[in-house]
Amino acid sequence: MQPTDWKPMQSVGAGVKEIRIRTGRKAYRTIYIANLPDAVYVLHVFQKTTQQTEQKDINLAKTRLARILRNR
């Protein structure tokens, strides 16, 4: 089952997705990967303050994904 408001985050890695949550004037994002056989991994959750996802948030998710894949 897919969330209703999401998009692929290929800039982070293959199979990574972003759930978009809006509450009033605030926006939140959850970056995760669910195509690994043992678990769903939440890579990063943050409040969005700009129109585009900031590079620091993408880099943090990439670093966490690399660590997960390296330790498998």
Task: For every predicted segment, state its role.
Residues 31:
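Basic, low-complexity intrinsically disordered segments
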Residues 1-27, 36-40, 47-72:
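Basic, Lys/Arg-enriched alpha-helical interface segments
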